């Protein structure tokens, strides 16, 4: 089973909790994230960047190969990050056969908010004190005037693509998404539900419908 990168986990918390599992062959130890991966739970933690995106994509593909009919849960606590890394995860979520249920714990901002709303319809959740933030993509470039113009056009094209994706999953128009993301737009869990970014605010485990008892 592909486990989580030790460096990623140490950088996030400074410590990797370990759990011991009793098997017919004796004891086996896992880091906590690999143990949860056995329950089809993937964590998207911290900044969305290429290495983290590769890790999440690999786990999505692995879980699909294990059981293409069983849902995958993606737990999100992220300030966002690189657009292309976020889109790599997004495309994989849409590509694989299992439904991907998303759950915001803490925050889902920028690219992470896009991934939150991209979960399977009816299976997008927030915990009650989570925060969600949407905005237009950020970009900066220094160089010759012609190159700056090229990068400005690319940023506008990326913005249009992101607006269309979010419009698809929230059932709003791209024009409304453009207006609402003109500046940082922070929402509570309830506001995110009203906006269409999620389907339900979870106040207890029973409502979530996850099969695991963890």
From Swiss-Prot:
The protein's matches in InterPro entries, at most eight in alphabetical order, are given as: ClpP, ClpP/crotonase-like_dom_sf, ClpP/TepA, ClpP_His_AS, ClpP_Ser_AS
- Origin: domain of life: Bacteria
Spell out the catalytic residues. Answer: 110, 135
Which is an annotated GO molecular function term of this record?
serine-type endopeptidase activity
Is Cell wall biogenesis/degradation a UniProt keyword of this protein?
A: no
The protein's UniProt keywords, in alphabetical order, are: Cytoplasm, Hydrolase, Protease, Serine protease
Under the heading NCBIfam families, the entry gives: clpP, PRK00277.1, PRK12553.1
Similarity-based family: Belongs to the peptidase S14 family.
Kindly state the subunit structure of this protein.
Fourteen ClpP subunits assemble into 2 heptameric rings which stack back to back to give a disk-like structure with a central cavity, resembling the structure of eukaryotic proteasomes.
The molecule here is called: ATP-dependent Clp protease proteolytic subunit
Gene symbol of the encoding locus = clpP
């Amino acid at each position: 089973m592909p486990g989580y990168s030790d460096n990623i986990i140490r950088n996030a918390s400074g410590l990797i909790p370990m759990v011991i599992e009793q098997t017919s062959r004796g004891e086996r130890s896992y880091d906590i994230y690999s143990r949860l991966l056995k329950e089809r739970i993937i964590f998207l933690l911290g900044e969305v960047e290429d290495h983290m995106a590769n890790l999440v994509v690999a786990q999505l593909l692995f879980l699909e190969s294990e059981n293409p009919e069983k849902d995958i849960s993606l737990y999100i606590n992220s300030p966002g990050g690189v657009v292309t890394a976020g889109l790599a995860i997004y495309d994989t979520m849409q590509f694989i056969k299992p439904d991907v249920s998303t759950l915001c714990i803490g925050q889902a901002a920028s690219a992470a908010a896009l991934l939150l709303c991209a979960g399977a319809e009816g299976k997008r959740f927030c915990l009650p004190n989570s925060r969600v933030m949407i905005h237009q993509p950020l970009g900066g470039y220094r160089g010759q005037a012609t190159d700056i113009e090229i990068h400005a056009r690319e940023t506008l094209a990326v913005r249009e693509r992101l607006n269309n994706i979010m419009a698809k999953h929230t059932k709003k128009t791209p024009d409304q998404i453009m207006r609402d993301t003109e500046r940082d737009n922070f929402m509570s869990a309830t506001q995110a539900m009203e906006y269409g970014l999620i389907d339900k605010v979870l106040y207890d485990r029973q409502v979530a419908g996850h099969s695991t008892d963890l």
